[in-house]
Amino acid sequence: MLAKRIIPCLDVRDGQVVKGVQFRNHEIIGDIVPLAKRYAEEGADELVFYDITASSDGRVVDKSWVSRVAEVIDIPFCVAGGIKSLDDAAKILSFGADKISINSPALADPTLITRLADRFGVQCIVVGIDTWYDAETGKYHVNQYTGDESRTRVTQWETLEWVQEVQKRGAGEIVLNMMNQDGVRNGYDLEQLKKVREVCHVPLIASGGAGTMEHFLEAFRDADVDGALAASVFHKQIINIGELKAYLATQGVEIRIC
């Protein structure tokens, strides 16, 4: 059995790490490189960096900090933000990133997933999915351009359909960003994760809602996700990664102990 992964998420805007609630009202957390180094030293299994306004601004992720991160950490990291071409991806990987993640650009051009997978291998192609639960319809819908409130829109894709589509096209991993839960720290959306797990045959990463160590345990135990991504509980030092991993190990979760 592969070890479960703990993945701090760093949302980047204007060269700094920020964090919002339900993808809105972002506050500045701190500088990118020191935070990345801290999380690596605490025992994170990998890091994810989202340049949250790159796609909505029509630009590629700011590459200046990618190489600096690569110099100070010795764990894998993934970079996302406005990657719309093979050249964009190649540059980010050449600066030291281990994986690239696409989200809004994949919705705009689903063939991008296949082209990236064919060129670089499925192991480094992650597809992020921003999913919103509509209480009126009882359905989960994929959203696009979520880094900019004024441009965020609901797509024609229902979440389960898009999960299956991106796998067919070559996604090597899926990060499910559950927007309703984002930043509120009352637990992952386990029901949604279970439904996605049934149709997801590549590694699945839960994102949005972690507030306690028990929330991580529930995601691993009840929804069988491969990794759990979180931001505010780590940024605000509510949970220490080393202590979290020790707790999960006592609960029988296969985890890499620091």
From Swiss-Prot:
Native source species: Escherichia coli O45:K1 (strain S88 / ExPEC)
Pathway note: Amino-acid biosynthesis; L-histidine biosynthesis; L-histidine from 5-phospho-alpha-D-ribose 1-diphosphate: step 5/9
Subunit structure: Heterodimer of HisH and HisF.
GO molecular function per UniProt: imidazoleglycerol-phosphate synthase activity; lyase activity
Protein's UniProt name: Imidazole glycerol phosphate synthase subunit HisF
Entry GO terms, CC: cytoplasm
Alphabetical list of InterPro entries matching this protein: Aldolase_TIM, His_biosynth, HisF, IGPS_HisA/HisF, RibuloseP-bd_barrel
Substrates-to-products reaction catalysed: 5-[(5-phospho-1-deoxy-D-ribulos-1-ylimino)methylamino]-1-(5-phospho-beta-D-ribosyl)imidazole-4-carboxamide + L-glutamine = D-erythro-1-(imidazol-4-yl)glycerol 3-phosphate + 5-amino-1-(5-phospho-beta-D-ribosyl)imidazole-4-carboxamide + L-glutamate + H(+)
Function: IGPS catalyzes the conversion of PRFAR and glutamine to IGP, AICAR and glutamate. The HisF subunit catalyzes the cyclization activity that produces IGP and AICAR from PRFAR using the ammonia provided by the HisH subunit.
Primary residence: cytoplasm
SUPFAM superfamilies linked to this entry: Ribulose-phoshate binding barrel
Compartment(s): Cytoplasm
EC number: 4.3.2.10
GO BP term, example: L-histidine biosynthetic process
Similarity section: Belongs to the HisA/HisF family.
UniProtKB keywords: Amino-acid biosynthesis, Cytoplasm, Histidine biosynthesis, Lyase
CDD domains the UniProt entry points to: HisF
Active site per the UniProt annotation: 11, 130
